Curated annotation (Swiss-Prot):
Belongs to the GIPC family. It comes from Rattus norvegicus. Keywords: Cytoplasm. Probably interacts with SEMA5A. The gene is Gipc2. This is PDZ domain-containing protein GIPC2. Gene3D superfamilies: 2.30.42.10. One of its GO terms (molecular function) is identical protein binding. Pfam families: GIPC1_GH1, GIPC1_GH2, PDZ.
Length: 314
């Protein structure tokens, strides 16, 4: 199907995946199967990023389930959690929790802090913002370009959740919808953002110390737990260096063309194209799985080029 004539198709059903918790059978000395070994429980340690005791979370298969588990441990509402970082309580956008969770990772949940309202004059076509979301309805600022319109407004910070644009509540919108809304704002006019910043951390020594020792408690496996919006989570091997570079390139293209960063979306796009032989097959595969995004053709060709480079060893 030519790229220009792509139609939306019903998303292909994902193939059945392994259970989150699996047991292994050990063989007896006489060749008779022994009793099943105790099921392995995947337990992760978590803290509130602004300071708290350490809690334990387990038995979840999606981001929303994980947030509910964390909220239950710390007796807060799941809607209070803006996003999570891995192995650091800092607002480090390179350490965001997405659809993959290392089996040794320590989770820090960043919760709602101060609300603020900011008026911005759109002097340029581009605001200099990169948007991402937490997978459960909260879009937030992942990057601010140096010297941009937003960079000049010092009250707007990386990590701020965008709650409203010009009075319109956007909770529940995906990152690409928020980016599109911001891009469509008229140049040389004022607009208003209602933001919620993450609760600020108290500088408590023991908290960072706990983060350093957490991996000893969790285990030594180097796999990752892949969280999915539908179906069970699965334990997978870490991606190869070549695959990781290709996914990062796709993520860079998402930022360039759409003003978003989403490593899980980039991974899904890579997986859709890795066994395709030409860009038209790739376009059909993306329409089946990600048709709602309506990616531009030029973007699709660039993504196909990034995937092809990896397949050809470049």
């Amino acid at each position: 199907m030519p790229l220009g004539l792509r139609g939306k198709k019903k998303a292909a059903k994902s193939k059945e995946t392994a259970r989150l918790v699996e047991g292994e059978r050990s063989g007896g000395s006489q060749g008779v199967p022994g009793p099943p070994a105790p099921a392995r429980r995947l337990v992760f340690h978590a803290q509130l990023a602004h300071g708290s005791a350490t809690g334990r979370v387990e038995d979840f298969s999606s981001i929303s389930e994980l947030y509910a588990k964390i909220a239950g441990v710390f007796e807060i509402a799941p809607s209070e959690i803006l996003f999570c970082t891995l192995n650091t309580p800092k607002i480090d956008m390179g350490k965001l929790l997405g659809g993959q969770l290392g089996l040794e990772d320590f989770i820090f949940a960043h919760v709602k802090g101060i609300k603020k309202e900011v008026n911005v004059y759109k002097s340029e076509d581009s605001l200099g913002l990169t948007i991402t979301d937490n997978g459960v309805g909260y879009a937030f600022i992942k990057r601010i370009k140096d010297g941009s319109t937003i960079d000049s407004v010092k009250t707007i910070c990386v990590g701020d959740h965008i709650e409203c644009i010009n009075g319109e509540n956007i909770v529940g919108w995906r990152h690409f919808e928020v980016a599109k809304k911001l891009k469509e704002l008229k140049k040389e006019e004022l607009f208003t953002l209602q933001l919620i910043e993450p609760k600020k951390a108290f500088e408590i020594g023991p908290r960072s110390k706990a983060g350093k020792t957490s991996t000893e408690k969790i285990g030594t496996s180097r796999g990752t737990l892949r969280l999915r919006s539908k179906g069970p989570a699965t334990v997978e091997d870490l991606p190869s260096e070549a695959k990781a570079k290709a996914i990062e390139k796709v993520d860079d293209l998402l930022e360039l063309y759409m003003g978003i960063r989403d490593i899980d979306l980039a991974t899904t796009m890579f997986e859709a194209g890795k066994d395709k032989s030409n860009p038209d097959e790739f376009a059909v595969a993306l329409d089946e799985t990600l048709g709602d995004f309506a990616f531009p053709d030029e973007f699709m060709f660039d993504v196909w080029g990034a995937i092809s480079d990896v397949k050809q060893g470049r």
